[in-house]
Amino acid sequence: MKSINNIISQALRQCQPLPDDVEKLTKIAIETRGLVSRYISPKVVEVIFGGSFAKGTWLKEEVDIDIFIKIDNSVNDKEFGQLGEQIGWQSLKGFNPYIRYSDHPYVEAVIDGIRVNVVPCYDVPKGKWKSAADRSPFHTDYMRTNLDDEKRNQVRLLKKFLKSIGVYGADIATGGFSGYVAEIMILKYGSFESVLHAMSNIGEENNVISIDKPDEYSVKNFKSQLIIIDPIDHKRNLGTAISAESIGKLVLAARSFLAKPSIDFFIKKEQKLVGNNMELYPNLVIAEFNYKKRSPDIIRGQLKRSLIAISKQLELANFKVVRSTCVTDEEETAAFGFLLESVTLSEYTQKIGPNIFMREETANFILKNQKKSLITWVDSEMRVSTLIRRKTTNAKHFLKLLLTKKIESTGITRGLVGDIQRLFRLYSGDDHKINGIAKEAVKELISSDQRIF
């Protein structure tokens, strides 16, 4: 087995940009900033670089160029958004630009294979934030000041590791660790390996990551498994955006890597279906549909929120959801997938009512269930019980009903309702025609990361 130092050196060669990469990226960045500067208005104070390019923490062959337009803080919110879009569209018009969404819309284009973002922010003093992007220039300055070349490479290793195990990105769909969080963790612990040691030993609570001494009042009021204090805004907890699943996966991946170092932890693994997984096919239900093209940020957020809503409806109908997922090709097709304990239920179910000494509640329970009850009795704990016939016993049929006649009341994001109503395809696990995006959902539901488990 190779030593951990050998593995880390090998991984660094995979993620550290070559001089030619730096030269190409810098050329595109400077030229694009020049285009943006042509179209600025008197209300624009400055045009600056931000993100991983500006901080020098970008990964080889995986980089965006973020250009921030600092707008005078006297501009109102509506004009702020309009100005940002206008400058972005005009400056990138030769590269088929499109709108992306965060707190405010911003404009993106791909130039010579490099994704370029033109993002508006207010020119404000530290702590006087008016938009979510206002902190970004301060983040950039902080990291450029505090990260040396060695730590920048350690950030690259951590980012590559997080990407490989699928927990990189603070968007709602991923619920993972942002690039900025990775930078903070390296500053806090000093190296990639030290971050893994720290994460592999976290406790059930009081997990605070703060470069400076944390404000006790703020920490007490933060509610998340990991509390990560933003060093330029101590009242902001970056850990709020990180899901329990992502934290858990990083903890287990860290333990596995430290126990048995492997370059595989820096390579994105395609999930494969193997023989043992196939026996779970009968427990799957997949809903696939086409949608009108929109920003990947929007569709992923809509899918995640809708997945939670549909899962809740399945649980309310007594279908135990073991695992769920949503996938998209980010072009036109998406799918919801559910692994259930069983796709069928017994025809009858017992409803247990109140204790007979709860006079009014007992009377109400009997009255409410009188017409649909097959039998009613008093059980050994002196509770009224009744046996009723289920409205549905098949998860596929239930999901079909949910996505047609009851779709308006399911909690599915309104932006997806029309897309689903136009046409959707339902598969159960024993269907042999599952392919495309639906197949990707199946892979996510019934496969395990062999590096960790």
Task: Please give the residue ranges for each predicted region.
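N-terminal regions immediately upstream of nucleotidyltransferase
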Residues: 1-60, 77-78, 106-108, 121-123
